[in-house]
């Protein structure tokens, strides 16, 4: 095989590896994220139906009616202590699972649950809540459950992707140079650093909970807007489905971005382990390739200067 042919072969192999990671991201989205968001959408729909069900004699309800306070005996029927206890038990399970998740992720999970518990405790102390507020609390509980599962599932997925990418790049490098040698298996702590310590100080965990906060606020605002406009149950349901679609699109972007990032980080770490000093940036040139990637295609960089997600 000539030098040009050999380079072409290895270039294709690198691009094939990138394509494999893209396919892995799509499989994860279909088998995991799509199912979770569909279930959350169903549960949120049920909460909206409960709100409208309080006024079953009407096709629509006003914002004034939705803001009517639940007091006295009806308020006492709400099992606030049970809901708070359930949240605390979930926090305890998260803490007991320490070792399966990084401390940073565990702290983020606990923080979100504690904030919701404090809010429910405040309603208990106040002794009253509106029909709308009650449904908003229940919807936030559903969303928190959704993003808890996202945190855990996405971490496990990225952990697996890093290890797979690292070993594949070590193998490819050894194949390229024509001999094998011993290499260090990445520790759990090293994998966590790769996943959580991005150059831009962002990571999947922080981004997910930003999504959760934004989505909860979005749902609250859209419920109020729909009620002010006197929308029917069907129109309100369509409004919330639309917002769920926006949230799912954000989740898809995150999975794809983090998959690309972790592939590049695993490749960099494998190159360093194998003593590679330089690498060539290769981009799949098609209609989806960004202008920045087009400009970097074919350029060479020192491995020690590599910044996954940037070059």
Cite the ranges covered by each PLM segment.
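N-terminal leader/targeting and assembly helices and adjacent pre-domain segments
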Residues: 1-241
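Acidic, glycine-rich two-metal-ion catalytic cores of nucleic acid-processing enzymes
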Residues: 245-311
């Amino acid at each position: 095989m000539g030098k040009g042919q050999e380079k072409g072969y290895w270039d294709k192999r690198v691009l094939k590896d990138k394509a494999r990671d893209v396919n892995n991201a799509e499989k994860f989205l279909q088998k995991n994220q799509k199912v979770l968001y569909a279930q959350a959408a169903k549960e949120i729909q049920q909460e909206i139906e409960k709100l409208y069900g309080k006024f079953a004699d009407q096709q629509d309800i006003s914002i004034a009616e939705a803001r009517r306070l639940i007091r006295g005996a009806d308020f006492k029927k709400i099992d606030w202590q049970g809901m708070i206890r359930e949240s605390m038990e979930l926090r305890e399970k998260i803490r007991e699972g320490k070792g399966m998740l990084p401390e940073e992720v565990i702290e983020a999970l606990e923080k979100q649950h504690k904030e919701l518990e404090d809010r429910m405790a405040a309603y208990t102390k106040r002794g009253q809540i509106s029909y709308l507020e009650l449904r908003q609390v229940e919807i936030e509980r559903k969303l928190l459950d959704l993003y808890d599962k996202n945190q855990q599932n996405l971490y496990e997925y990225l952990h697996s992707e890093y290890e797979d990418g690292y070993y594949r790049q070590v193998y490819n490098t050894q194949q390229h140079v024509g001999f094998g040698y011993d290499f260090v298996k990445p520790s759990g702590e090293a994998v966590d650093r790769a996943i959580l310590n991005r150059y831009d100080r962002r990571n999947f965990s922080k981004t997910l909970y930003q999504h959760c906060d934004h989505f909860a606020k979005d749902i609250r605002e859209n419920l109020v807007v729909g009620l002010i406009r006197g929308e029917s149950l069907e129109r309100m349901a369509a409004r919330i489905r639309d917002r769920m679609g926006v949230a799912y699109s954000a989740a898809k972007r995150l999975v794809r971005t983090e998959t690309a990032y972790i592939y590049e980080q695993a490749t960099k770490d494998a190159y360093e382990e194998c003593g590679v000093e330089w690498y060539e940036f290769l981009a799949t040139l098609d209609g989806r390739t960004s202008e920045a990637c087009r400009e970097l295609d074919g350029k060479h960089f020192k491995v020690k200067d590599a910044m996954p997600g940037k070059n």
